[in-house]
């Protein structure tokens, strides 16, 4: 059996729309800008061009131009360039599709550290129904700031429901992605950081994402990729990483406990030797580990060895993990323009 055939058997690509299914779209294997534009189906657009060949030269000015209480999709096309600004999508401006020209081509960056995570963010999403494609978001705060009290340097703060990022990249040294609340979908994104660089209380699927670990000399012995905060069993939240890979230039934990019911799962993910043997830590959390839900399912690579895993770390079965790998974990069939459904 060839590699292509095996992949078809393992994965079922589901490309649907909240406005109805499309049989021809289901054959597509790439979630690109034309497909998303087709599914979002709007002719309302604003063009941002740093060279002055569009409607605005600033991303924030384009957002400001979206009507308050917007109830229909509008495309904000941010053409290639490095936009040195901080961007805020306020709560009263939902249904925005921010379309870049590709991560590495369309870049939004600032250099801001703060004692407060939200205050430091380069990019803030507080409006429901937000979709982004092909954009890099950076917080380039100097490394030296890491040794002061103003050491938070968030790239993106996501505090809204029904938010999706496709082929985007997030860069910072510390606390890169504040995935705060709501249902979120990250597809083939790149996320770089060192300490707690994906953190918050959200309900999120990270599908085929690259997690790159960089060095931070503040941390002895290691930093952590995730710090998911969950206070009770009733909270239907958690971070689920499906496929993708974890690699980098420093050692790291997959996650640390943040609250007694912290929930993070890595499934079918390549774990390089960057991942330390313990895998998980309760660093700074001094309560019981009984209700922590830190688990792995069919991960592979040198960092996936389980002999020395933390006592509470779970080696999940198919039955235990199946509901988390379903797009229904984030109710995605009702709001995502396109998604990938994992099949066993």
Swiss-Prot record:
PROSITE patterns referenced in this protein's UniProt entry, alphabetically: PECTINESTERASE_2
Active site (UniProt): 196 (nucleophile)
Enzyme class name: hydrolase
Chief site of localization: secreted
Compartment list: Secreted, Cell wall
Entry annotated with the keyword Oxidoreductase: no
Annotated EC: 3.1.1.11
Pfam families documented for this protein: Pectinesterase
InterPro entries for the chain: Pectin_lyas_fold, Pectin_lyase_fold/virulence, Pectinesterase_Asp_AS, Pectinesterase_cat
Gene Ontology BP, a term: cell wall modification
Signal peptide (residue range): 1-23
Tissue and organ distribution: Expressed in flower buds.
Gene3D superfamilies hit by this protein: Single-stranded right-handed beta-helix, Pectin lyase-like
UniProt keywords, alphabetically: Aspartyl esterase, Cell wall, Cell wall biogenesis/degradation, Glycoprotein, Hydrolase, Secreted, Signal
Molecular function in Gene Ontology: pectinesterase activity
A GO CC term attached to the entry: extracellular region
SUPFAM superfamilies on file: Pectin lyase-like (SSF51126)
Taxonomic superkingdom: Eukaryota
Glycosylation sites recorded in the entry for this protein: 43, 151, 282
Sequence similarity: Belongs to the pectinesterase family.
Protein name: Probable pectinesterase 67
